[in-house]
Amino acid sequence: MGRHILKHVFAVGGIYCSFLTWGLLQEPLNTRVWPNSGCTFQVPYIVALVQATIAMICGLIYIKWQKPVLSLSKFWTSHTRDMAIISLSQAISAPLAAYSLSYVDFLTYMLAKSCKLLPVLMVHLIVYRTPIPRSKKLVVLLVTVGITIFTLDGHKPSMTENDVSESSSSSSLIGFVLLGSSLFLDGLTNAKQDKLFQKATYKITGAHLMFALNFFLIVWNVIYMVLVDRQQLAKGLKMLHADPEISRYLLAYACCGAIGQCFIFYTLEQYGSLVLVMVTVTRKMFSMILSIIVYGHQVTLWQWVGIVIVFTGVVCESMGKKNKAKEGNIINEEKVKQS
């Protein structure tokens, strides 16, 4: 009994420690104006490349430690095409989310990325034409209302700021289009992962996904920077040379993300999706609160109301999963994505 509790604390504590630190590193890495470079580190494909490289190495170590029944070579030959397609949506989603930070504040970004149900339902409704239950529609309504309240109250125009307000509204719209596109691709990734698990003839573990998806993320990011945007690599290297502190943030951020993925898959395999969902929801709440405290974000009363409404919707969705678990119909909706 004591050993079981220690394993549980180890799994949950690992997720909290790695992803709370990951969240605290993500904000300055993406939004800080670095002193010597004089600009933000807006090179998302380099960030994704470094993170994927470290995560792939961790995934390989995880496979060696886990020794799954399905060998890596057999998994590779059977699911190469699936991994390439799933990773492509991930490779596009992450930079879109990073670019959205040029137009929306970090708390809005975190709040939107906390709502995994929205993109999943969008994909099932638009792509797979799946009927949406009334309970999920209610959750979507709560989340949408909460984000709207949070965003609108954070952009109240004063009587003498009409021109600035119009410019801000236009920028916010661009930010939400980018963020919404990223969320839709996240939903597409999760839906394709669900299909992969359903059709698999052998048990696919988190370690398999972690290694293969990150391998293809490296491939896609390298292809993009070589064929489409060579300036991004040059800009990134120039900034890393001018501000060496960025490299420390970047490596720490990537390591926390990779370690966090290991803990997510470990928790999923040991305790199931229900425990993982509850840990993920509370972790995201604490990440927002920690960001507000550490970085001194000003949050109005109505914005707090918006945050509470959003997480009420997310908790309702988690409770719905709990009821399904009791009926023996757990649907695995938490795979590779971190908040």
Curated annotation (Swiss-Prot):
Secreted in keyword set: no
InterPro entries named among the record's database cross-references: SCL35B1-4/HUT1 (IPR013657)
One cellular-component annotation, GO: endoplasmic reticulum membrane
Annotated keywords: Endoplasmic reticulum, Membrane, Sugar transport, Transmembrane, Transmembrane helix, Transport
Family from the record: Belongs to the nucleotide-sugar transporter family. SLC35B subfamily.
Function as written in the Swiss-Prot or TrEMBL entry: May be involved in specific transport of UDP-Gal from the cytosol to the Golgi lumen. Involved in the maintenance of optimal conditions for the folding of secretory pathway proteins in the endoplasmic reticulum.
Listed name of the protein: UDP-galactose transporter homolog 1
Gene: HUT1
